[in-house]
């Protein structure tokens, strides 16, 4: 377990300063490395299923192993720094690159702001950046829903999960998680090219998100009163609707947000979560839930850490 001060500073750096330029971003490097491995071990587009499975596995293994070596070595180097404050800042700064707190909020706020100004066309284009569905014909209600779904789901992927793995395994844990999450985003499709090639990445992402997604859901339940939600409906959503999405993990945070704020989130033809009118105010409150759930996680981790260590 690492000192919670590292996690707090890392999250604050990302929340208020944001991510580094693309050329310096470790996650961008990971993505480029995966693209390189795809060329070395290419997909057969499901023509040779076993070959796709093997090459997909090799791509995931080499990526995870490389990320582990880099960040484990980096952590060893940081531990050699004798000045506490230099080490604290350096470690926290690097760790902040594994978190997407500010970007999550910015991307989710954008379509909501366009809706508030009455610009539905720009809202559709904006929300297309954060969801995979076709948004070109979505009405106002479904644009807001897509934005809330994205922010709710990505509480786990972008913040809570990296912090959990950092807390337990340090830098290498946080960045291995981000590597797997990145590979799932790049390879985890059920189309001809990735149906078999991306299975390892998709399954590993499901495994690594299983516990963090459920912890994130519980954090959202406990913090519900702070973002304008209700605890009892949130619990109902967690227990009764968390499993309704195609992903085994993404539904828990979305169902809690939907039910705690009494609004229906709908991906047309796929799922419906919660009941009630979806409004801009409720969407804004759902974004507040991001900050409160992260704050609660950091407080709980700090209490656990100092009680276990001292």
From Swiss-Prot:
Q: What family does this belong to?
A: Belongs to the CobD/CbiB family.
**TM segments?**
53-73, 80-100, 157-177, 215-235, 289-309
A GO molecular function for this record?
threonine-phosphate decarboxylase activity
- Disulfide linkages recorded for this protein, renumbered to the chain, are none
Task: Specify the pathway.
Answer: Cofactor biosynthesis; adenosylcobalamin biosynthesis
What biological-process GO terms show up in the record? cobalamin biosynthetic process
Localization per record: Cell membrane
By its UniProt entry, which InterPro entries does this protein fall under?
A: Cobalamin_biosynth_CobD/CbiB
Q: Which Pfam families match?
A: CobD_Cbib
Coarse class of the primary localization is membrane
Q: What is the organism of origin for this protein?
A: Methanococcus vannielii (strain ATCC 35089 / DSM 1224 / JCM 13029 / OCM 148 / SB)
Q: What does this protein do?
A: Converts cobyric acid to cobinamide by the addition of aminopropanol on the F carboxylic group.
Q: Which GO terms describe its cellular component?
A: plasma membrane
Q: Which UniProt keywords apply?
A: Cell membrane, Cobalamin biosynthesis, Membrane, Transmembrane, Transmembrane helix
Which named protein is this? Probable cobalamin biosynthesis protein CobD
Query: What's its membrane topology?
Result: Multi-pass membrane protein
């Amino acid at each position: 377990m690492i000192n919670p001060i590292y996690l707090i500073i890392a999250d604050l750096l990302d929340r208020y300063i944001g991510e580094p330029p693309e050329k310096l971003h470790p996650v961008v490097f990971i993505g480029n490395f995966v693209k390189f491995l795809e060329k070395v071990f290419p997909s057969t587009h499901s023509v040779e299923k076993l070959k796709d499975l093997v090459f997909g596995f090799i791509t995931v293994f080499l990526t995870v192993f490389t990320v582990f070596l880099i960040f484990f070595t980096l952590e060893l180097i940081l531990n050699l720094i004798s000045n506490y404050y230099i080490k604290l800042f350096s470690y926290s700064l690097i760790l902040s690159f594994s978190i997407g707190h500010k970007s999550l909020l910015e991307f989710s706020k954008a379509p909501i702001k366009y809706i508030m100004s009455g610009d539905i066309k720009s809202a559709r284009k904006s929300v297309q950046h954060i969801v995979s569905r076709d948004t070109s014909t979505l009405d106002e209600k479904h644009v807001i829903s897509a934005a809330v779904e994205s922010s709710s789901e990505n509480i786990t992927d972008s913040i809570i999960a990296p912090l959990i793995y950092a807390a337990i395994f340090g830098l290498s844990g946080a960045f291995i998680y981000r590597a797997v999450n990145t590979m799932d985003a790049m390879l985890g499709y059920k189309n001809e090219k990735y149906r078999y090639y991306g299975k390892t990445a998709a399954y590993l992402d499901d495994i690594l998100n299983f516990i963090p997604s459920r912890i994130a859901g519980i954090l959202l339940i406990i913090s519900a009163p702070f973002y304008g939600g209700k605890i009892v409906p949130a619990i109902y959503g967690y227990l009764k609707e968390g499993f309704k999405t195609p992903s085994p993990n993404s539904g828990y945070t979305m169902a809690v947000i939907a039910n705690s704020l009494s609004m229906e989130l709908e991906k047309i033809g796929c799922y419906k979560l919660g009941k009630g009118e979806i409004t801009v105010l409720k969407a804004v409150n759902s974004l507040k839930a991001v900050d409160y759930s992260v704050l609660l996680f950091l407080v709980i981790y700090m209490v656990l850490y100092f009680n276990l260590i001292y």
